């Protein structure tokens, strides 16, 4: 089968939005080439885990590559993707050039080549995220491994927002906590919560592909006795109370449900949010406070923030 590689040149703050647009358009795989990755490991306290080839990354901005089967409707799909991306600036998301290029590739070329982007990465004092095909030996008995298979279009959990959410969970999860993960994606945050001692984790996503991916990864990590995965839109119809809600979503989506979060989280419970570019920190904090939360801590990494808030 012939496939088309759609490459979009954009900015880091648009990565999650553009990736979501590509998934919704039916991409069979997405790879992100961010030059910030070339220096990230040297800058973090956990040391350089692996070496990256600078020739595979753009000089500036971020290159997002998605793979679509070649069909008669491909041109319409690309036009739809472009239209959706062009709307992002109206949500204060800078897209940079937004240039789109198309290349033809053979199935055997892309079906395995994307694996070069994924390697074991220690993202905190507790967790190392390991792709399923990589061999990895923990460096200490305390180190916890999360195995992920990103083959269903979700990444390996090393984006700054995911990293900050996991570190926030490390700070806050108590033995026996009940937790809801809103917009679970690959399920990585739910798996981390289970491995940190939660007694029950409800993981929800509106995207059926995400639900399938999360279910697979939950089983892979043997946390399916704690984590249940289901399809749902944010917190619609969800009853509480629970000890903690975590949501790694775009700021515009988080703004849709602070009141629901306050309803579902027990009094004194926590709401952890990320997916927030630094420029949106104030508006998210104000929305949380208006809903009755108190901001306890803000984590920062690169141009992103995560907020830990406590319910009244």
From Swiss-Prot:
MF terms in GO = protein-lysine N-methyltransferase activity
Cell compartments where the protein resides = Cytoplasm
Alphabetical UniProt keywords: Cytoplasm, Methyltransferase, S-adenosyl-L-methionine, Transferase
Instruction: Set out the biological process GO terms recorded for this chain's protein.
Output: methylation
Mainly resides where?
cytoplasm
The record's GO CC annotations read: cytoplasm
Residue positions binding S-adenosyl-L-methionine: 162, 183, 205, 248
Q: Which domain of life is it from?
A: Bacteria
Instruction: Tell me its EC number(s), please.
Output: 2.1.1.-
Which reactions does this protein catalyse? L-lysyl-[protein] + 3 S-adenosyl-L-methionine = N(6),N(6),N(6)-trimethyl-L-lysyl-[protein] + 3 S-adenosyl-L-homocysteine + 3 H(+)
Family to which the UniProt record says this protein belongs: Belongs to the methyltransferase superfamily. PrmA family.
Q: Which HAMAP family match?
A: Methyltr_PrmA
Checking PANTHER family in the record gives: ELECTRON TRANSFER FLAVOPROTEIN BETA SUBUNIT LYSINE METHYLTRANSFERASE
User: What is this protein for, i.e. what is its function?
Assistant: Methylates ribosomal protein L11.
Descriptive protein name? Ribosomal protein L11 methyltransferase
């Amino acid at each position: 089968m012939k496939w088309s590689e759609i490459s979009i040149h954009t900015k880091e703050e648009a990565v999650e939005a553009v990736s979501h647009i590509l998934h919704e358009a039916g991409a069979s795989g997405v790879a992100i080439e961010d030059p910030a990755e070339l220096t990230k490991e040297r800058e973090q306290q956990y040391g350089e885990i692996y070496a990256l080839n600078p020739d595979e990354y753009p000089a500036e901005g971020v290159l997002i590559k998605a793979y679509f089967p070649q069909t008669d409707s491909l041109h319409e799909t690309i036009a739809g993707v472009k239209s959706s991306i062009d709307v992002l600036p109206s949500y204060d998301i800078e897209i940079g050039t937004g240039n789109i290029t198309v290349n033809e590739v053979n199935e055997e070329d892309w079906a395995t080549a994307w694996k070069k982007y994924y390697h074991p990465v220690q993202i905190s004092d507790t967790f190392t995220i390991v792709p399923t095909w990589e061999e990895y030996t923990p460096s200490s008995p305390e180190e916890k491994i999360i195995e992920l298979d990103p083959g269903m279009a979700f990444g390996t959990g090393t984006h700054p927002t995911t990293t900050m959410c996991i570190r926030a969970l490390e700070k806050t999860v108590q033995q026996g906590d009940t937790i809801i993960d809103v917009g679970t994606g690959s399920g990585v945050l739910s798996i981390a919560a289970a491995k940190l001692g939660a007694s029950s984790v409800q993981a929800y996503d509106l995207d059926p592909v995400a639900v399938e991916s999360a279910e697979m990864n939950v089983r892979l990590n043997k946390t399916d006795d704690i984590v249940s995965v289901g399809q749902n839109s944010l917190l619609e119809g969800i009853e509480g109370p629970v000890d903690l809600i975590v949501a790694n979503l775009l700021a515009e989506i988080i703004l849709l449900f602070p009141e629901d979060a306050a309803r579902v989280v027990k009094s004194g419970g926590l709401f952890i949010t990320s997916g927030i570019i630094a420029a949106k920190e104030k508006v998210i904090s104000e929305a949380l406070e208006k809903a009755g939360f108190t901001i306890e801590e803000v984590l920062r990494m690169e141009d992103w923030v995560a907020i830990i808030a406590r319910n009244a």
